[in-house]
UniProtKB/Swiss-Prot annotation:
Lineage of the organism: Eukaryota, Viridiplantae, Streptophyta, Embryophyta, Tracheophyta
InterPro entries: GET4, TPR-like_helical_dom_sf
Record's function text: Involved in the regulation of root hair growth.
Gene that encodes the chain: MDC12.19
Family as reported in the entry's similarity comment: Belongs to the GET4 family.
Protein name: Protein GET4
Amino acid sequence: MSRERIKRELPPVQEHIDKLRKVIEEGNYYGALQMYKSISARYVTAQRFSEALDILFSGACIELEHGLVNCGADLAILFVDTLVKAKSPCNDETLDRIRCIFKLFPRVPVPPHLVDVSDDEDVQNLQESLGEARSRVENLTSFLRAAIKWSAEFGGPRTGYPELHAMLGDYLYTECPELDMVRISRHFVRAEDPEKFASMLVNFMGRCYPGEDDLAIARAVLMYLSMGNMKDANFMMDEIKKQAETKNPELSESDLIQFISYLLETLQRDALPLFNMLRVKYKSSIDRDQLLNELLDEIAERFYGVQRKNPLQGMFGDIFKMMG
């Protein structure tokens, strides 16, 4: 059958949307998912992308509204895949749809890991809850990573639309059972919302293990600097110091925090020898996390033109790592 004939024979899209909603409301969730995929594929084949997107957007929202995270995420990812096929530009209308889908992903408090290990039912309930939380995070991450990549390719900033990074960073922080602050920070430094990032780090300071707080702050500031973003790096440090005066006064005594403070002052002038001296003096603190050395190498290249021995080792040299 020719593409033109398919175009003519496809019915108005609202008929499918109404029919599929009824299928879900009748409880045939898996059947509805397969129908959403097959029907939208017919519209894509006919290059009626706008209507395919209408079907997939509706399906993702309805499935998520019914608590069907896996099904909703499948359709949400297919929605973004169709944006790419249609070469849809990154604009407010499409971003609004992505926001709508994002808001429908459930947020469920992660249960405390401390349970009575002698109670098999408690242990089983905890394992199930943690497994469900990981699944939600993986689904949301796949959707937003695809959306970030689409936005970067079709009119957004080279590293992806900032708000999408903010969405993903926030969800990872609040919903993931095992916090990965490096991964979370990668998104927040691209979110153009240093106030929110600073608030999150202050919150993290109140729940992390001793010795993790100064590392998280140092990584955040150095990530900003590796991108040449002095303004937000300084804002972050000032805001953290302000908050720590009452909540964590010992933070200012950390050698790593002292190093970051001196570094911010040094980068405001042409002072490569001083930069190198600071790295030597605070080497033991910097060596607590290899990522700090990698970021400092990138900062040396950006601010002082110092070539890295192997540029491919730089965390931010690979745009695909950024998407993680």
